[in-house]
Every structure is written in structure tokens, then in C-alpha cells.
């Protein structure tokens, strides 16, 4: 099942502070919803374990994440792959980090995912709604941590 998403998150923090945060694998990993563990491998790679629940499909997903920052363009791309309990997901996501003026920043993000296995069989609407919720939670966590 192929899924596509996009949106924006306004963050009341300056561009440099936001850029430093979103390119730090420890910080990014801790913003994943229902994260159980984050293990940083190097400055652009980390592993994460997240608790997943979509319909009757519940368990832990092990994810491998690669951050691909482009400092000149202020764009961060991510590749995420992994799975658990017979399901798998491959995702690409990106965010443009844009100066919104007055000490604020906007993250303009997009992503696409391919899900396979029991999690994909749950049904498009259920999976799509859950994925949208998780993405919104992740960006809300980024905003919350940078607003503190």
C-alpha cells in the first residue's frame, strides 16, 4: 500500500536552532511517536524501536533511519526502513526548514511510505488515518521541544 503526506509546522524558534535540532539523530529519534529506544550509530544514522498499533495489528517496529541534510538548501531528507510482526515499511520524508521571520521557522514537509504485510491489510483508511496522526504527533513534539 502506497501512502503520501505533506504539511507544515510553524515553530516559534529561530532557523539555526531548528536546523541544529532536526539534523541531530538523537533529537529526531526522540520525536518519533511511541518511541521505546533510540540508538545513534553516527551523525546521520540511528536505529529506533517504536510501539505500533493499527487496528488489530500491534507490536514493536525496529526502524533504521538515515538523515540526509543539505545545509545549503536547508533541507533535510530521511530514509526510514524496518518492520516487525510480519509487516514492513519503507519511507522517505523531507522537510524544508524555512525562516518565517520574527524568530520563527516553518517546516514544510512531505513524505511517502510503502507498507507491506498485516499492517497494510488493515485497510487504507485506517492505516492512512493512523499514519497522519503519527506524523502530526512527531512534528508537534518537535515544536514542543523547541518551544521549551
Residue ranges: model-predicted function:
Residues 7-9, 35, 62-69, 80, ...:
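Hydrophobic/aromatic beta-strand elements that line small-molecule binding cavities or substrate pockets
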Residues 118-148:
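A conserved amphipathic terminal alpha-helix motif
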Residues 1-53, 148:
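Hydrophobic ligand-binding cavity/cleft-lining segments
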Residues 79-129:
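Beta-strand/loop substructures that line and gate deep hydrophobic ligand-binding cavities in soluble
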Residues 2-8, 45-47, 60-62, 75, ...:
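Intrinsic-disorder/low-complexity, polar/charged segments enriched in Ser/Thr/Lys/Arg/Asp/Glu/Gln
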Residues 25-30, 55-59, 84-88:
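Short, solvent-exposed secondary-structure boundary motifs
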Residues 39-81, 137:
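Glycine-rich portal/gate segments that line the openings of hydrophobic small-molecule binding cavities
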Amino acid at each position: 500500500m502506497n501512502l503520501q503526506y505533506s504539511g507544515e509546522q510553524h515553530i516559534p524558534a529561530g532557523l539555526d536552532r531548528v536546523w541544529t535540532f532536526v539534523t541531530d539523530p538523537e533529537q529526531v529519534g526522540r520525536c518519533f511517536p511511541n518511541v521505546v529506544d533510540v540508538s545513534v550509530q553516527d551523525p546521520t544514522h540511528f536505529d529506533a524501536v517504536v510501539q505500533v498499533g493499527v487496528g488489530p495489528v500491534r507490536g514493536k517496529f525496529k526502524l533504521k533511519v538515515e538523515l540526509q541534510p543539505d545545509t545549503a538548501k536547508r533541507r533535510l531528507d530521511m530514509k526510514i526502513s524496518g518492520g516487525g510482526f510480519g509487516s514492513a515499511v519503507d519511507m522517505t520524508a523531507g522537510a524544508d526548514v524555512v525562516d518565517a521571520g520574527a524568530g520563527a521557522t516553518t517546516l514544510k514537509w512531505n513524505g511517502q511510505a510503502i507498507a507491506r504485510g498485516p499492517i497494510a491489510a488493515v485497510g487504507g483508511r485506517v492505516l492512512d488515518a493512523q499514519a497522519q496522526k503519527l506524523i502530526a504527533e512527531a512534528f508537534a513534539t518537535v515544536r514542543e521541544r523547541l518551544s521549551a
